[in-house]
């Protein structure tokens, strides 16, 4: 159940109740692609840094260790020891971006595993079956994430097929949830709006998928090559056509600035690999922008990454020490940076929710964006 608690302009402060707990939105989903956050971060760490919901990848877990094995072990929650909500993406993005020699038909997609090259077929039914075996809280519909700069004819054909796939996903999910041995009979299904940067195609698709009465709706196919301005323009035009009584999810986005701007356009859910990926390379986020701990000026810096930060890294270690660990290629350095970045993102969302509740989001966003430019000017 989705309940809007407060609005401030187009920004929404809401809560989304699931069988695995209630999520306070806007929220950032911490990305654990293979049922773990890259950077030696455990689910016990996620509890400590305030993570509300985790995201795992259908394609990767299907390939290794196998969704049937995870079902045999009681589902993804038990497998990774996580009792809060989990969203699984459909595998579509990976099929269309990572896998080699793919062949698209109405039935689905045949492609090669990125691990050993063996052929895999995945269509709407297969994606739903895999996600049902995982038992995630929220399953994403199987879709084609077309390149942002694909021509209009290709995008239109892709969107029409994605809609037909969504109808099949809904039917299959209903069947799977009714089975006596299903891991999570309350599994939810989110549909995905596609259409590249063609707003008229996206709006038409948004209207069509809205009629299917799903548990939530995502805007997909962005942050794949278009400019930020194009992405925001899509959100400005499309989000108003998605159901306002259901959560809205912007897939794969993004930077702190992207999140601030997109919340202002009505988005509830976000996910992105940036916090963990950048952290593993010594790039850490602060309210004054992103800094590179490999920079020589931090060699003798005794301050934490960010003053006042409550993360395990900032509470215990200096920039100089973390820089030393990174230079020495000690895994602890990478782990501390990832923990800090995830804490930063989670805390940013806490501040965003408070600003909306208090009716001051416009000013909060403006100040936050201004502060983030500080390091860029040094």
UniProtKB/Swiss-Prot annotation:
Reaction catalysis annotation: 7-aminomethyl-7-carbaguanine + guanosine(34) in tRNA = 7-aminomethyl-7-carbaguanosine(34) in tRNA + guanine
Annotated spans, RNA binding: 252-258
Keywords in alphabetical order: Glycosyltransferase, Metal-binding, Queuosine biosynthesis, Transferase, tRNA processing, Zinc
Cofactor note: Binds 1 zinc ion per subunit.
EC number: 2.4.2.29
UniProt GO molecular function: metal ion binding; tRNA-guanosine(34) queuine transglycosylase activity
Keyword Transferase in annotation: yes
Family: Belongs to the queuine tRNA-ribosyltransferase family.
NCBIfam families the UniProt entry points to: Q_tRNA_tgt (TIGR00430), tgt_general (TIGR00449)
Protein's recorded name: Queuine tRNA-ribosyltransferase
Species of origin: Lachnospira eligens (strain ATCC 27750 / DSM 3376 / VPI C15-48 / C15-B4)
Lineage of origin: Bacteria, Bacillati, Bacillota, Clostridia, Lachnospirales
Gene it is expressed from: tgt
């Amino acid at each position: 159940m989705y309940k809007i608690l407060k609005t401030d302009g187009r920004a929404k402060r809401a809560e989304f109740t699931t069988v695995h707990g209630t999520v306070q939105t806007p929220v950032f989903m911490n990305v654990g692609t293979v049922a773990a956050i890259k950077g030696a971060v455990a689910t016990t760490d996620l509890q400590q840094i305030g993570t509300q919901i985790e995201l795992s990848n259908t394609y990767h877990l299907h390939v290794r260790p196998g969704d049937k094995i995870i079902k045999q072990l009681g589902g993804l929650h038990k497998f990774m020891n996580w009792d809060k909500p989990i969203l699984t993406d459909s595998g579509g993005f990976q099929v269309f971006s990572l896998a080699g020699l793919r062949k698209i038909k109405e039935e689905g997609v045949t492609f090669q595993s990125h691990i050993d090259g063996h052929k895999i077929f995945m269509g709407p039914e297969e994606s739903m079956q895999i996600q049902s075996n995982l038992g995630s809280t929220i399953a994403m519909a199987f879709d084609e994430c077309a390149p942002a700069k694909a021509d209009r004819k290709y995008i239109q054909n892709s969107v029409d097929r994605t809609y037909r796939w969504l109808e099949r996903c809904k039917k299959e999910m209903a069947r799977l949830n009714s089975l006596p041995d299903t891991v999570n009979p309350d599994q939810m299904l989110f549909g995905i709006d596609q259409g590249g940067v063609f707003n008229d195609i996206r709006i038409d698709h948004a209207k069509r998928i809205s009629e299917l009465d799903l548990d939530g709706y995502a805007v997909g196919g962005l942050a794949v090559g278009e400019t930020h301005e194009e992405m925001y323009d899509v959100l400005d035009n499309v989000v108003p056509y998605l159901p306002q009584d259901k959560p809205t999810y912007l897939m794969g986005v993004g930077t702190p600035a992207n999140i601030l701007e997109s919340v202002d356009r009505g988005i509830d859910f976000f996910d992105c690999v940036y916090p963990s990926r950048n952290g593993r390379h010594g790039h850490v986020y602060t309210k004054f922008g992103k800094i590179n701990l490999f920079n020589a000026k931090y060699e003798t810096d005794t301050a934490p990454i960010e003053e006042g930060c409550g993360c395990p890294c900032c509470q215990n270690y200096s920039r100089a020490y973390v820089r030393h660990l990174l230079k020495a290629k000690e895994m602890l350095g990478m782990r501390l940076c990832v923990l800090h970045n995830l804490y930063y993102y989670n805390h940013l969302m806490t501040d965003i929710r408070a600003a909306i509740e208090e009716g001051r989001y416009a000013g909060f966003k403006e100040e936050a964006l201004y502060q983030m430019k500080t390091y860029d000017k040094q």
